[in-house]
Amino acid sequence: MFPVAKLFNVLLESSAMPIETFTAQVESIENLTHDVRRLDLRLIEPKTIAFKPGQFISFEMPDSHTGRVLTRAYSIASQPSQSGVITLLFNLVQGGPGSGFLFHLQVGDKTHFKGPAGHFYLREESERELLFVASGTGIAPIRSMLLANAERSDPRPATLFWGLRSQQDLYEQEELTELTRRTPTFTAITTLSRPETGWSGSSGRVLRLIEERIASVNNLAVYLCGNSAMIADATALLQKKGLCPIYREKYYDDTGSPED
């Protein structure tokens, strides 16, 4: 994914962290669904990375058609305390040089990236309740935020709405169940827009959850991450419910087109 951060009703803040070049080695690979992969990278030099939950790193790779160097950014899905190994969650985009590059990496391969970067990160100073809304692999930076929150026993009530298409697209559900067990103030709902027979969970677009379950936003801080249509529609819907800080990360597929 190629993320672009935008904010509504908040000031754009500097991440205040230097961008470095890192060398890392692929430690493990797991296929989570038919097109989503988890990649764990162990840092070699430097051996650790300091980042804020929600930030991203960038890879460079050659364009197979023109030969020019391309840059693609991927959100860190692991928590900052796991500073020696970082996790990426990403899906395969047909014709996408970034996901193609990452999908071809094998355990033991070495690679390089730059980071951390990005203004889409968890603000810890606010006392507002937290609402996280994700579509698809937009869960990646939000996962980092949720894990960081759980580690420090954040007392703020937090809710996650995550939209996927069908049962074959489900992943990380056991982890979310465990997070809700460990954190009584955390609620997670996964909704499927095109559920198949046998699905007993929430159905419909993730916007439906916002419409039905969020009466007021006056005491909320909202984090949105996903495709451009979801970001635009969710922002408009939230605006109708009142004023609150909204932090947005709009994903693009790595062909350069909005991931709709």
Write out the residue ranges for each language-model feature.
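Conserved S-adenosyl-L-methionine
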Residues: E151-P157
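Reductase modules of NAD(P)H-dependent flavoproteins
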Residues: F8-V10, P18, S166-D260
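Ferredoxin-reductase
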Residues: L11-V107, R194
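Residue-level signal for short, function-critical loop segments
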Residues: D63, L92, G136, L164-S166, ...
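Histidine-anchored nucleotide/phosphate-binding helix
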Residues: I139-A150
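Short, conserved phosphate/pyrophosphate- and ester-handling motifs at nucleotide-, phospho-/glycolipid
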Residues: G54, G138, N227
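A short, basic/flexible loop-to-alpha-helix module at the beginning of a structural domain
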Residues: G115-S126
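A structural signal for isolated positions on well-ordered beta-strands in alpha/beta enzyme cores
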Residues: T87, H112, L131, T159-F161, ...
